Structure formats: structure tokens, C-alpha cells
Amino acid sequence: MKSHIESLLAQALDVLKQQEVIPTDFEARIQVDRTKDKTHGDFATNLAMMLTKIARKNPREIAQLIIDSLPEDAQVSKVEIAGPGFINFFIDDSALANQLMTALNDDRLGIALPQAQTVVVDYSSPNLAKEMHVGHLRSTIIGDSVVRALEFMGHKVIRQNHVGDWGTQFGMLLAYMEELRAQSGEQAQMELSDLETFYRAAKVRFDESEEFATRARKLVVALQSGDEYCNKLWREFNDISLSHCHEVYERLGVSLTRADVRGESAYNDDLAQVVRDLDSQGLLSESNGAKVVFQDEFKNKEGEPLPVIIQKADGGYLYATSDMAAMRYRANVLKADRALYFVDLRQALHFQQVFKLARKANFVDDNISLEHMGFGTMNGDDGRPFKTRSGGVVKLVDLLSEADTRALELVRSKNPDMDEAELAKIAKVVGISSVKYADLSKNRASDYIFSFEQMLSFEGNTAPYLLYAYTRVAGIFKRATDVDLSDAKIQLEHEKEKELGTKLAQFNEVLTRMVSKGQPHALCGYLFELAGAFSSFYEACPVLAADTEEQKKSRLLLAKLTAKTLKQGLGLLGIETLERM
């Protein structure tokens, strides 16, 4: 409906151009928003106030001219001017009911497919030298929810898991792997089952033994030179590490597969060419033996230019180099229209610099949108990044296991007579969903405090609340098995029916915002509000005990569409629904 109002306003502007009220070459940005106060209608625009200077008239006068130029439309019952020149649109109840019926009878809930784009999404991207920890949670689940929404909206999505599978630390790890296998193959396999412990043990050997450190450095050189033996060891290690990652992805219900992995090593053969191309365009400078790029747009507090280091003095490459190669690949080979990077906000300057440089070097053209979808940190009660009690890094798999345990205790307390198999099944969904939703419901640009107590609450904007809301709605139909809805129609008569219908009609707008801005919290907030609107409707409007059969069927249809929307919305967040809690 929002896009329909925008279309009506565009037609009105065409009339005003013909009447020479505004110049024919003027391109106005039409913005239509939902009103918060329904006494001011359903939608409002400040378009008239934006045209004041160009039309040389006061806003209310322009607003009236716009209203007079609007085409007749059966979906709009009334248009009014408010305040200094806002234009308020009231949607006809029967038009809203028809929109809801269309959504109910459509697998896509009435959401039209936009012009499809190719969208490359870089997310999760753990360092394979170590096991995944809580710091990887946000990129993984925020990126995955946006990917799901993009695909639902009809876009072609190419997932890119840009894992850290290259670097000097791999010499140390391969040396330790080699050492353990010489002692005992079983010991090596056992230690590799816990990568965090394996990494720490390798680091101790590297720091304490000069002979081990020398061997590790030689292995790095051999690996980078394409040595067959070293490459075999390296591939084995990465395969084991990726297996750990995909166990976590499976538990999280994340859609990443092995086919989506394109790590740093995939660009090794392109890095020297990146340096040559930057050099040939006169963009490279030398600083302390390193090859760098200075850009006038980026300076430190003292006003000195900040470098983008492309190649170290020892010939090694950095993140900027591989990121430039990846951007060129995504633009020219994958033919991306958008490239989204779900990476910590603390990398904002890095991405600003490499995005700007990639355009200057013509690695990408202006047709591709490069977007850093930065996010804040997940913190403990002390407001600092989440750690174990001893100050160590929390492994993601341990966090999920604790969520399962706590969820099982919660579900058992609510259902003391339920059998253990059913309890475990429900607890698994509740535990993982609670961790994911607690994160996704926060503005991604903000830090947040991680709290099991809050995320497992049945009150407020939490996964348990929404999962229970869904089971409550779905449960109505277990008591209405004899009702034939084949010829039923939605009728919006009671105020709470209209409020629920209005909220249901906003699903498309919310998803559009989510995919354009990479903001899952917009969808979370919407689903929470929808559950609240249904609760208010259910209390005020008896469903199975409605006054008439026609009214009962209409309210059952509203309940059915609510259930479909909640299920679809939670599914886009990567959250499985339950029929019973």
C-alpha cells in the first residue's frame, strides 16, 4: 500500500508539472511513512513542504494542489491536510481487507517480487586457525537472516564465507601437527578435536623452542611456495577446522555450506597483480619499505594522511590486498549489484578506505554498491566483550550448549509431566532461538549485554515470547477443525480487527527495510508488535465464540494470516517454530 500511495503522489506531481506549478525537469524524492497516530490516517507525506522553494508557495497551498491533482482511487477513503502541510491518507477498510485476503492466499504473503539484483554477502568468515568463538556469532546470524530475507524478496544471493585460511600462523600450526603425528597419529587427531587447545599448545611450542619456531617459519615459506607436502598438511588442517565451523552452523540453523567458502587463499594468485595495477596507476607510495596508498580523504587527528598498507617491507600482503582482490572478483566475475560485508564496526575505517581505493583503481565501477554492514560487540555484565570467568574466549559451541541446558530447565519447569524426548526437542529450539533472537532484535550497530536470564524470558521482545505467541495462534485451529473457511472473507469492523489488519499489511514494508539496510531488528520489532496486536485482538474479539458464523470465519482468517506471518518472519530470522511449548 505504501508504494501505491507513492505512485499516486508521482501522478499528482506529473499533473503539477503540466500545470507549470513545478519545473518539468524537477525530480522530487517522494517519501511516505506510516502514521503513529491513526487519527492522522494510515500514511503521511511531507512532500508539500519539500516543494515550498521550488513552487514558491506556502506548504498548505501546495498540499491542496497535490490533493486536487491526485487521481481517483478506491483504496483511499480520505485525504487531509494536517499541521504546516502534511498530507494524510486514510485507507479504505474494504481495500485493506482485500489486501489481507490476497496475502492469505499467497505463499509469498502478497509480497511482489522487485527487480532482482545479484547480491554478494560476506559473512561469518572465521579464522580457521582457531575454533569459532562468541565474537563470530553476530556476523554469522545477522548475515544469514539478511540472506534469507534477500532470497525471499526474489534476489539472487551469493554467499561468501571469506575464512581466514592463510597467514604466518599456519606455519606454527602445521609444525605442531607434524610433530604430534610423528609421536602418535591418535594424539594429533585428539588434539585437533579441540582447536583452541591445539592453537595454544602450538603457540607455547613456538615461543619456547627456537628450533620449533625455525621449522614453523620454513613451513610458511614452503607453503607459500606451493610445496606439495605443506599444501597437503594445510588442506587437512583446514578441512578439520571447517568441519568444526559447520557443526556450529548446523546447530545455529545457518544456511552456509562448504560450497560458500572462498577464503583468503583463493586470492593468493591475484595479490601481486593488485600491487602491479595500483603501481601502474601511480597510486602506490613507499613508506619504511612498505608499499602503501595515501588518500586525501583519510587523515589522523594531526591531519596526517592515513596509509592503506598493500605490501609489507618483507613482501607479505595484508587484509587490504586480499580485500581488494575479493572486491574485483565479486564485481567482475560474480557480477554483483551489491556487495554486503557483515564485519565488526571496529573495521569501519578499513572498509571506507578500501572501498574508496577500489573505485579509484577502477577495480569496481559505480554500478556496484559496496556496503559495510557493521555491528557492535556482544558484552558481558561488565560492559566489556563477553569472556569466560577466567577471562578467556568463550567458544561458540560451549555457549550454545549452555543455552540448550538452560532452555531444558526452563521448558521442564513449565511442563513437568512432558516426556523427556519432547522436552529435549522443544528445549533445543528454544535455546538456540533465544541466543539468535536476543542478538538479532538489537540494532546491529549497537553493543549489547548478553544475558541468559533476559533472553529466556517469556515476557518482552524475546524468542520464547514469540514462539509461545505462535503456538497460541496455531492452537486456535486445533479447536476449529469443523469450520469450513473456503468461502470466508475478512471483514474489518471492530477497532482491534482493523489494528491487527493494519499491522499485518506492514510485512512488506518491514522486509524492504531489512534487506535495504541490513537490519534484522526491524523484523524482530515488527513480529513483537504483531504478536501484541493479535493478543489485543484476541482479548477484545471472541473468535470461536463470535456473534455470527460470518464473523467467526473472518476472525479465523485473521488468526490464520497472523500465524503464517509469524512463522514466515521467524523463518527469515532462521528460527524454527513449535506447535507446542
Curated annotation (Swiss-Prot):
Coiled coil: none annotated. GO terms for biological process: arginyl-tRNA aminoacylation. It is found in: Cytoplasm. Pfam families: Arg_tRNA_synt_N, DALR_1, tRNA-synt_1d. A motif ('HIGH' region) lies at residues 126-136. Gene3D superfamilies: Arginyl tRNA synthetase N-terminal domain, HUPs, Isoleucyl-tRNA Synthetase, Domain 1. One of its GO terms (cellular component) is cytoplasm. Its main location: cytoplasm. The keyword Repressor does not apply. GO terms for molecular function: arginine-tRNA ligase activity; ATP binding. The keyword Zinc does not apply. It comes from the Bacteria. Monomer. HAMAP family: Arg_tRNA_synth (MF_00123). This is Arginine--tRNA ligase. The lineage of its organism: Bacteria, Pseudomonadati, Pseudomonadota, Gammaproteobacteria, Alteromonadales. The gene is argS.
